[in-house]
Structures are given as C-alpha cells and as structure tokens.
Amino acid sequence: MAKNPPENCEDCHILNAEAFKSKKICKSLKICGLVFGILALTLIVLFWGSKHFWPEVPKKAYDMEHTFYSNGEKKKIYMEIDPVTRTEIFRSGNGTDETLEVHDFKNGYTGIYFVGLQKCFIKTQIKVIPEFSEPEEEIDENEEITTTFFEQSVIWVPAEKPIENRDFLKNSKILEICDNVTMYWINPTLISVSELQDFEEEGEDLHFPANEKKGIEQNEQWVVPQVKVEKTRHARQASEEELPINDYTENGIEFDPMLDERGYCCIYCRRGNRYCRRVCEPLLGYYPYPYCYQGGRVICRVIMPCNWWVARMLGRV
C-alpha cells in the first residue's frame, strides 16, 4: 500500500507533461496560422493596390488613320503611337512622295524623313510639359523687349552642313529610320510682319520649296489660330534693321550655332522673341501617350538674343 502514492505521482507528472506539450503545440499552430493569415492578407492588399494604382504600361502600339482634303485632293495620314518608347510616327503619301514624321518625346527630338529626297531633317522639341501657372505680374503688351511669334509665322530652314555626330540619336527611333540618309538640323526663321500682311491682304502665296510646302500642309491641323500683330511695333522694328548687331566678335567672342539650334538663345535677333506653339499632352496620365486632347495647350517661351546674355553677364543690362 505504501508504494501506490509514488506510482500515482509519476502518472500525474506524465499526464501534466503531455497536457503541457499539447498546449504548446496548439499555441504554436495558432501563431503560425496568424502569421500565414497576415501574410496572405498583405499579399492580397499589395496585389489589389498594384492593379488599381500602378499604371500598367501597354506593350502594343496603337494605329490610327486620318483622312483629310488638301487642295481638293483626298489624302490619308497614318499615325502610330508606341507608349513604351514614347514615340509618335506620322506617315503620309506613297512612293517618292512618302513622308515620315517621328516625334521622340523620350529624347526630345522630331525627325522628318522625305523618301524622295533621301534626307532627314531634325529639330528639337520639349520632353517634359511644363507646369502652367498664372504670372504673378502682368506683362505690359507695349514692352519693347519681346514680340510674340506663333507657329504660322515661322518657317523651318535646313542648315547648310549635314549632321556628322549622331550620338545624340543613339537610342532614338529617328536613327532607325534616318540611319542611311543625310541628316540636317532645321532652324526656325521668322516671317516679317509685312510679309504676313501681304499674304493676308493681297492673297499672294509665299514661295516655299516643294518639300517644305508639303510639310506645312501636313501640319495644318496643329497650327495655332491666326492672331493680329500690332503695326506700331513693326515700325520700330524697321528702324532697328538699319543698326548693326553687336555680336561681340571684335572682342574675340564667337557663339556656338548649337545655342541657336537648341533654342537657348538667338544669335541674329535684335530683341527677345516670344515663341508659342501647341503641345499635346496626356489626359490625367492615361495611355496612349501622348495624344492631343482638345487641340492641345498653348505654351510660350521667351528666347533672348545671345548678345543680350553676354551684356547681362558683363553688367551692362
């Protein structure tokens, strides 16, 4: 009878150990289940958030055909938009009359390729659309420093020498199209106010080269509506034409032509010019990018003469 209590105590210890072990296993299972539940919930939230808030970049290109009439003749323009490379290609004409216009919004260049000429013309364009903000101070319209020129008062003239270094187009769609042809920079040339008035009043046609005329006809839909230019400012401009331009060549200063080609300053201008153009922008960031929403937005920038910047650095203005 005296040996029974120790045996009962050993049984109690065994039962307590088994109960503690089972409780420990249940607690571990609960912790593991809670961790897996939190991980699953986190993955679901991340998947839902990435699907709804992360913009999905489409991998396909978008094609569109536009029909219009020019001089009584029906013509077609094919537009191709590649959202991945941010390029926009316009094709028009057939055979030797075919023209390709490539807008590279990633690198900030526009290339125009004429199949008949076997030449490519390059010009710069904006890469990032600037934020629009109301000016803090009102601009005096009679200010003598700036004049506004719109797209219809500008013609693009090719440079005399072709482009030798093409490294700036290394990752551009323009180089794929214009790789085996001669490439030229084209620079904007302003049409004087008298020429615009003669064109409007007398109806005389400006004598553009055949290729430039085709390019102007193809871009008629992007031109800013005509505006009236003040005649008083033209009278002052006529008197300034008689004065020589101080380009500081006597002091050993020579301006790089790239400053003019890239739009940093104007070498042969007598005063600052405000250049306005329409810019197509995405609507709330949706693809395809870019496309023209409600005709685009007019953005203006002031290009000052290069000698004005030199005078400013010398403290003369």
Curated annotation (Swiss-Prot):
Which residues of this chain are annotated as glycosylation sites? 94, 180
Top-rank taxon: Eukaryota
Q: Which UniProt keywords apply?
A: Cytoplasm, Disulfide bond, Glycoprotein, Membrane, Nucleus, Phosphoprotein, Signal-anchor, Transmembrane, Transmembrane helix
Which SMART domains has this protein been placed in? BRICHOS
What is one GO cellular-component annotation here? nuclear envelope
- Disulfide-bonded cysteines: 120-178
Kindly list the residue ranges recorded as spanning the membrane: 31-50
Q: Which residue intervals are topologically Cytoplasmic?
A: 1-30
Q: Which residues lie on this side of the membrane: Extracellular?
A: 51-317
Q: Which family does it belong to?
A: Belongs to the chondromodulin-1 family.
Its annotated function is as follows: May be an angiogenesis inhibitor.
Identification of the protein by name: Tenomodulin
The gene is: TNMD
